[in-house]
A protein has these predicted regions:
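Acidic/histidine-rich catalytic neighborhood of metal-dependent amide-processing enzymes
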Residues: 126-197
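Acidic-glycine-rich active-site phosphate/pyrophosphate-binding loop
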Residues: 98-114, 177, 181, 195-205, ...
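Short beta-strand segments
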Residues: 94-95, 154-156, 181-184, 205-207, ...
C-alpha cells in the first residue's frame, strides 16, 4: 500500500460508519421516497438537491455543482480535497441517481425494513450507494485521512437509459483521473467487478416485394425470410468462450398470412469482452448483405458501451482493495459480468476502474430490491480505506 491502512484505522472507520448509520439511512430513505425514474425531471432535481445539501455540509468539499441535463434532470458533481498533494490525477467516484422504477412504484412497494434488510425501489441500484459516497467523503475528513489525490464524485441522471448526456461528463472526468471507483451494486456475495462486457444495439430492416402468397408467390421477395437468414448469420457469431453473445430479441414483420411480406425488422443486442472483438463484430453486423438480391436491407446502430477489461492496472487496483478489506477482516472477491455501467466509458480511456463497490443486497430492477444493513459500515470503511491508500 502507498499508505498504511492499519487495523487501528480500519476499526476507527468501522466505528465511524456504525455511528453514522442512522443519519445515513435517513438520507437513503429520503432519496428512495423521492422517485426519480430516468426522464423524471422533477424527481431527478429533487434527489440531486438532497445530495447537494448534504455534501455542502462536509469538511473538505470545495464545490458542489448541479449540472442541467436536457430531458433527464440534473447531474451532480462534488469536488473535495482539491488541495491534495498528488498531481497525477483525481480519484473519481461514479454513480447515478436515476432508477428504472416509474413514478408510483413507491406506493406499491414502500420503504420496508425486515430481517436486516431494507427494501425500496432503487435502493440497491443505487440510491443507498449515492448516500454512501457522500458519507465516505465525510469519513475521510472526520478521520483525518485526507487523500493524496483530489476526489471527484459524479452522479449522473441518465445511466439506466444509456447515458445520453452523462457519458461526456464521465469521459471528461475520467481523463483527469488517476483511478475510477464505481459505486454500482456488487455481484452476489459482495464481489467487486473487475470486468464488464461492452454492449451494442442494432436494428436490421429488410425491404422486400409484396405478392399474393397463393396466386403469384414467385413475384414476391419475403422480407421475413431475409430477416430469418440474417438471424442465422448473427447467431453464428456467438462465442461463449470469448464472452461474445449476439441475441435477436425482437422481430416484426408482415401484414397477413396470405401476403408475401414486404417489410420486416429485427432488434439485436450484442455483448463482447474486448475492444478488439467490438470492432470486428460491429463491422460484421453493419456490413450485412442480403441473401436475396431482390431484398434491400438497412442496418442501424452500433457499439454504445466499450468493455471494461481486466487489465494489469485494474488487477493492481483490485489487489489494493483486497488489502484494505483484509484489514477490515473480510475477504473481497471479484468477478466478470455481462452488464455494462458508466465505468465502461472510463475504462476505454485506459484508466484503472474498479466497479461494484456499492452496498451488498439483491434485486436490482426487481420488486424485491434491497440492501443488507450489516454491509453498510464495512463497505463504507472499504471505500474510505481504498481512497486513503491510493
Amino acid at each position: 500500500m502507498q499508505r498504511e491502512f492499519s487495523k487501528q484505522v480500519a476499526s476507527a472507520a468501522l466505528d465511524f460508519f456504525n455511528s453514522r448509520q442512522g443519519k445515513m439511512l435517513a438520507l437513503v430513505r429520503a432519496l428512495v421516497e423521492t422517485e426519480s425514474a430516468s426522464g423524471d425531471l422533477e424527481g431527478s432535481r429533487a434527489v440531486v438537491q438532497l445530495l447537494a445539501e448534504t455534501a455542502r455540509e462536509i469538511d473538505g468539499v470545495t464545490s458542489v455543482e448541479r449540472i442541467e441535463s436536457p430531458n433527464y434532470g440534473e447531474h451532480l458533481r462534488v469536488r473535495a480535497f482539491t488541495d491534495a498533494p498528488e498531481s497525477s490525477g483525481t480519484v473519481l467516484l461514479i454513480g447515478h441517481t436515476d432508477t428504472v422504477h416509474p413514478r408510483g412504484s413507491l406506493q406499491e412497494r414502500p420503504w420496508r425494513a425486515s430481517d436486516g434488510r431494507i427494501y425500496g425501489p432503487g435502493i440497491f441500484d443505487m440510491k443507498a450507494n449515492c448516500a454512501l459516497a457522500v458519507e465516505v467523503i465525510r469519513a475521510l475528513a472526520a478521520l483525518n485521512l485526507a487523500p493524496r489525490h483530489a476526489v471527484t464524485l459524479l452522479l449522473t441522471c441518465d445511466e439506466e437509459t444509456g447515458s445520453a448526456t452523462g457519458r461526456a461528463l464521465v469521459e471528461a472526468e475520467a481523463r483527469r483521473a488517476h483511478s475510477v471507483l464505481v459505486l454500482e451494486p456488487p455481484a452476489p456475495g459482495g464481489r467487486v467487478k473487475t470486468a464488464r462486457k461492452g454492449t451494442g444495439i442494432f436494428t436490421i430492416e429488410a425491404h422486400g416485394i409484396a405478392a399474393h402468397a397463393g396466386l403469384e408467390p414467385e413475384k414476391g421477395a419475403s422480407a421475413i425470410l431475409e430477416i430469418a437468414r440474417q438471424i442465422e448469420r448473427l447467431h453464428a457469431m456467438n462465442d461463449p468462450s470469448r464472452g461474445i453473445t449476439v441475441n435477436v430479441g425482437v422481430v416484426h414483420g408482415g401484414t397477413r398470412s396470405n401476403v408475401v411480406p414486404a417489410e420486416a425488422e429485427a432488434e439485436i443486442d450484442l455483448r463482447f469482452s474486448t475492444a478488439e472483438d467490438a470492432k470486428k463484430l460491429e463491422a460484421a453486423i453493419l456490413g450485412a448483405r442480403p441473401f436475396d438480391e431482390r431484398v434491400k436491407i438497412k442496418v442501424r446502430g452500433g457499439v454504445n458501451r466499450p468493455p471494461l477489461e481486466r487489465t494489469e492496472k485494474v488487477a493492481k487496483l483490485f489487489e489494493l482493495a483486497r488489502e484494505v478489506a483484509a484489514q477490515l477482516d473480510f475477504e473481497l472477491g471479484e468477478t466478470a459480468v455481462g452488464g455494462a455501467s458508466d465505468g465502461n466509458f472510463a475504462a476505454a480511456l485506459n484508466v484503472p476502474v474498479l466497479d461494484g463497490l456499492g452496498i451488498d443486497g439483491d434485486g436490482a430492477h426487481a420488486i424485491h430490491e434491497h440492501i443488507i444493513v450489516d454491509d453498510i459500515a464495512r463497505r463504507g470503511a472499504l471505500l474510505t480505506g481504498l481512497i486513503a491508500s491510493l
